[in-house]
């Protein structure tokens, strides 16, 4: 199973070509991978559109994917614990949503495609599975 952070979806919809958007293209084309979308990522991506036509295009594309709920009580507790452990190690994760995404991916053993520095310490210290 694979999921994609908003940092990559935003680049993808903006037409920015990166390693991560190429990985996303491959995941969209390859049905052997279960590509899922987290509810919090859906919100992060869609909230940024000012123009209705762009919002409609992104919403239509994202609606084709199964949406998973990231914010269960177990995931919230795991995200809070991970934040505290990283702070103790001298690392501050800036985004609570990134903590939820990371904790969900760790619990589900779901590979994450991202382009966001907040996920690096989660990978290094907590074994966040990432698609490389």
What is each PLM-predicted segment?
Residues 1, 102, 106-132:
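Acidic, PIN/NYN-like endoribonuclease modules and their adjacent C-terminal/linker elements
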Residues 67-113:
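Active-site neighborhoods of divalent-metal-dependent phosphate/nucleic-acid chemistry enzymes
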Residues 52-56, 86-87, 129-132:
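Short, hinge-like loop/turn segments at secondary-structure boundaries
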Residues 5, 37-38, 94-95, 116, ...:
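Histidine- and aromatic-rich ligand-binding microenvironments
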Residues 23, 96, 100, 118:
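Amphipathic alpha-helical recognition patches that constitute DNA-binding helices
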Residues 9-10, 42-45, 119:
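A generic structural signal for short hydrophobic patches within well-formed alpha-helices
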Residues 21, 42, 55, 76-80, ...:
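A general structural signal for well-ordered alpha-helical segments in protein cores
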Residues 1-37, 47-60:
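Short, well-structured N-terminal submotif of metal-dependent ribonuclease cores
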